[in-house]
């Protein structure tokens, strides 16, 4: 394979991995530990 192809595949894989981790953190099991500042400051 060419170097440019390997670099493009690597960057794409990293981007997909980061997006998956961000979605898991936002909506998965760790999301229960996140605090909501709007809920804490109820008027």
UniProtKB/Swiss-Prot annotation:
<feature type="transmembrane region" description="Helical">
    <location>
        <begin position="5"/>
        <end position="27"/>
    </location>
</feature>
<dbReference type="GO" id="GO:0009535">
    <property type="term" value="C:chloroplast thylakoid membrane"/>
</dbReference>
<keyword id="KW-0150">Chloroplast</keyword>
<dbReference type="Pfam" id="PF02468">
    <property type="entry name" value="PsbN"/>
</dbReference>
<keyword id="KW-1133">Transmembrane helix</keyword>
<keyword id="KW-0934">Plastid</keyword>
<comment type="similarity">
    <text>Belongs to the PsbN family.</text>
</comment>
<dbReference type="GO" id="GO:0015979">
    <property type="term" value="P:photosynthesis"/>
</dbReference>
<protein>
    <recommendedName>
        <fullName>Protein PsbN</fullName>
    </recommendedName>
</protein>
<keyword id="KW-0793">Thylakoid</keyword>
<comment type="function">
    <text>May play a role in photosystem I and II biogenesis.</text>
</comment>
<keyword id="KW-0472">Membrane</keyword>
<keyword id="KW-0812">Transmembrane</keyword>
<dbReference type="InterPro" id="IPR003398">
    <property type="entry name" value="PSII_PsbN"/>
</dbReference>
